[in-house]
Amino acid sequence: YTPLCGTGNKPVRRILSELGFKHVYVVPEQENPDPNFTTLDYPNPEDPKAFTYALRLAKEKDADIVLATDPDADRLGVYAKDTKTGEYVAFTGNMSGMLIAEYILREKTATGAMPENPALVTTIVTTNMTKPITEAYGVKLIEVLTGFKFIGEQIGFLEAEGHPERYIFGFEESYGYLSGAHVRDKDAVNAVMLACETAAYYAAQGMSLLDAVNALYREFGFYRNALGSFTFEGETGMHKMQGIMAGLRTSAPKTIAGYEVAEVVDYDTDGTGLPRADVLEYRLVNGAKLMVRPSGTEPKIKVYLSAVANSEEAADAINTAMADAAKDLSLIHI
């Protein structure tokens, strides 16, 4: 485990100790807060480079999983050992989220702890794999706009109705997770606990986290996600971004990557049931989707890709084709 020179060290070690995890190895070079982040180019658990020291220690200790929390301990990155090759495989936020979600739903169902009318909350750009998983367990799936504050808002709504226990779990693709209604934001300490508990559950069955993910893919379908972005610098760039979004609304593509567009959802209208937002979603006949939105913090247009197929390779190929098509659409010319 590495707190990436941030605040996660003490609370993470404490919670794992209280849960009985005895073989926890903390990266010594990144154990204590360091405002200069001397050992890191960028202290972000989404960046593979941030795991350099942790992966080195993991190989030395033959660890099963590798965890990194960001400096303010609200996001969690995960690597898991491939027992066939001995290498460590990076989990996306979607992979970690759906694995933990399915484990929580499985255990609550098995122990009779599932509340009435349970709900799981994700964002509109998070993996579609949550749909068949929640359907399998009879759990309502609530999709909200991008940003964990909207997941927290749903907890508030349930609390206002007098039923906060209905909230089971929430996550977003950008490495944010939360179980329970104790806070209103993503919580990496909570997520570490859930990841380790999930890993222990599968280890007791002789499975690694990677084995578990692949088993879920085989059961529910190979859902794969990808993210691309296009940068537009300066004031002219902002105008160009606005023009691109306007152009998409007036002349939406009929096909993307050779697949017919079955439905277009414009979140900047009143018909979605969500607050209006500058987001466009293209749902294709093959179950894939492409979403386009301007970044709220950078001069970028982000493109979210999601595909499902009968193999990982086939789903990745669809996403690659959609990414190539996005570059050619009249909306995005760099």
Q: Can you describe what each PLM-predicted range is?
A:
Residues 1-21, 28-30:
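Active-site pocket-lining segments that scaffold enzyme catalytic pockets across diverse folds
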Residues 3-9, 73-75, 125-128, 235, ...:
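Gly/Ser/Thr-rich loops at beta-strand to alpha-helix junctions
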Residues 12, 74-93, 130:
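Short Gly/Thr/Asp-enriched flexible loops that form oxyanion-binding sites at enzyme active sites
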Residues 20-78:
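N-terminal small/polar loop signature for handling phosphorylated ligands or for N-terminal nucleophile
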Residues 50-53, 100, 150:
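Well-ordered alpha-helical segments embedded in enzymatic catalytic cores
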Residues 59, 63-65, 87-89, 107-293, ...:
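Phosphate-binding and adjacent anionic-ligand microenvironments
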Residues 89-104:
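Catalytic or ion-translocation cores adjacent to nucleophile or general acid/base/metal-coordination motifs
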